[in-house]
Amino acid sequence: MSFTPDTAAAIARARQHGVGDLLRRTASRYPDKLAVVAGERRFTYAEFDAAVNRTANALAARGVAKGDRLALLSRNCWEFGVLAFATAKLGVVLVPVNFMLGPSEIAFILGHSGATGMVAQDAFTATAEQALAEAGLTGGVRGRIGGVAEGWEDVADWWTVGPADDPEVAVADDDPLRLMYTSGTESRPKGVMLSSRSLIAQYVSCVIDGGMSADDIEVHSLPMYHCAQLDCFFSVDVYLGATSVILPGPDPAALLATIESERATKLFCPPTVWISLLRHPDFDTRDLSSLRKGYYGASAMPVEVLKELQRRLPDVELWNFYGQTEMAPLATILRPHEQLSKAGSAGRAAINVETVLVDEAGEPVPPGEIGEIAHRSPHAALGYYADEEKTADSFRGGWFHSGDLGVMDADGYLSVVDRKKDMIKTGGENVASREVEEAIYLLDGVAEVAVFGISHPHWIEAVTAVVVPKPDAALTTDAVLAHARQHLAGYKCPKYVVFAEALPKNPSGKILKRDLRARHGDLATRDGATTS
């Protein structure tokens, strides 16, 4: 059956199911319900939707259109949430930027993404200006969160004036909405393209397998530039009509106080932050009795910490979320009743995901054997922006090949045993060992270096460098660390530096990092260990 173009367009608009549409529907269902809390600001869903619409219309009036890329450099704030949904309603691709990166690292993302505009929080305006200059970007929209500055508009003007009508832009299911830069395993980050199809399928998996509901009151303290906090939790809360309490960061005292004051029921933290909460003196004095749901990810929860959490927060159910940015990001879930019986496991595939382990030839491996973790799902990204070669390799055969190695038992429970290409996950952040190695190689006197992660009681994994000096070089730990800090974001710098006469290698000359991990894996517990 065929219809006139006008009728077909009207039907398509009626059926549109994009991320931006989710907010409009939630605001229609729960107009007076508390949507977002950030400091003294409190928005109902009707108010939040109006702020999003005004922002979208303001961006459109400034020439920002569907398909354009808008970079966002900011800590968590309610404005971040507004921009995430305003860009989604316009079909503009949001490019969240890690605020811990330096100007050169940000400049690469700006240039590679093709960003035509940028919004920066006041604390990062100077960094943003350096990055924009280095990237050669002189035009486009520049918005500042936190007031006006020379060359920057105060973004408060965007959501306080102008029409609050929905912009009514036709956004298709597979139009890109997010360009998330992941460290991957390379010296340069890759831009992962996520669409409404990817994100909403992932939201459904989070809701069903993660036990989420409209009654949740969630504290968001992990960086929203990560798709975990932004799209496993904040956007899902908006989808459901739950309440989001936004903190600028995971300060333990502030987190505990906020759980008490807002009667929060739900919290996501990587294990490092859960450990910080447990060790904080306020943990036993704050009223945390409202908390019912706890989530962790980014790395495995140490079993002793898991037991302590269950002992000290007996009414809190725990979920382990495992995945990758390319999966928007959820792939597998370990549910509350499985936490101790399957301790250390990443759980089973989420409802909208198929997960298998494959060998080097792409063939499935039997239960109990190590293989590369691969997923097939509508969660999956559209690919890597402007990188056909890496996209073809990672998505070969219709499966996303994660680069992680794992073992699956006969019941389908996955355990992650290694990262195929030496990714380090420290404090919830991804660090590519190659990038750190390349930075250290720039230091005079370095003959060889190998960077890897070792177990750490706080960071879960600590970046560790074994350095082989050149003959007669007078290298010191302080010199290596000072050099690293000049070239890398702080979280990428080594926590431990070890000097050696040689690196272990196989007959073909490949450095045996597994041997190095075994040799230096107890550095965190040694007396006198050198740490940054």
What is the meaning of each model-derived region?
Residues 11-19, 24, 32-77, 81-85, ...:
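Conserved AMP-binding/adenylate-forming core of the ANL superfamily
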Residues 16, 31-32, 150, 162-181, ...:
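Conserved pre-ATP/AMP-binding loop-to-beta segment of ANL
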Residues 24, 57, 61-62, 89-159, ...:
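Structural core segment of the AMP-binding/adenylate-forming
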Residues 44-46, 177-201:
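Conserved AMP-binding A3 loop
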Residues 56, 68-69, 75-103, 111-117, ...:
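A short helix-loop-beta submotif of the ANL/AMP-binding
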Residues 101, 107, 118-122, 267, ...:
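AMP-binding/adenylate-forming catalytic core of the ANL superfamily
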Residues 200-217, 225-266, 280:
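Conserved AMP-binding/adenylation subdomain of ANL enzymes
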Residues 264-268, 280-341, 354:
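Gly/Ser/Thr-rich phosphate-binding loop
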